[in-house]
Amino acid sequence: RPTLVFNLCDGYDDVGAPGLSVVRALEEAGLAYTGADSRYYEISSSKLVMKELFRGAGVPTAGWEALPESGPVDGLCERLGAPLFVKPSASCASYGIGLESVVHTDEQAAARRDTLRSGEFAKWFAGDTIFAEHFIDGAEYTVLMGGYWDDPDGIWSLPPAERIFDNSIPESERFLSYDRYWGYYKEETPPEDGRAF
């Protein structure tokens, strides 16, 4: 009788949240499973790897630069064009994303990097690259796609979904931060009257 494993493990193994190791074990065992295969998992776990693939395929993406582990980032804003968005390369569910992720100076960029290295999320990003990319102000969309890398004609997608933010939020803050994603509001003020962002 065929077996299908519903794989809900999509974490990062190096911080104790099973992910790629489970996918590889399922593949080695020859079991059918739901979710991405190991090849996709490997390339999609790093935003920098994805951005390089986008660039190589001619897909427009905001300019970016990996930040040094510590010290100043002189000329960063001039090279990429402020404002910038500072974030970890390997992150999901808005971990490490906050209102301070949008920076306007080199000093703010270095400070945000240092916060990611030493703050609440430091354990998640210990071996990760922190990078900055040009902040694109505008609508935020999500598109779910499926298929196989070796069968590009079989790739499908659902209609794009736009995240609509409350008009009270300044345009430069209309992105999904950790507080908004999870509704914890540790760094941000919750919306008035229980309104959703």
Give residue spans per PLM region:
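Phosphate-binding site of ATP-dependent enzymes
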Residues: 108-195
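Conserved N-proximal alpha/beta basic substrate-recognition cap immediately N-terminal to
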Residues: 1-66
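Active-site nucleotide/adenylate-binding loops and adjacent lid/helix of ATP-dependent enzymes
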Residues: 41-131, 137-139, 148-151
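Flexible, active-site-adjacent loop/turn segments at secondary-structure boundaries
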Residues: 10, 31, 38-42, 65, ...
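Short connector loops/turns at beta-strand edges and beta->alpha or beta->beta junctions
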Residues: 31, 89-91, 183
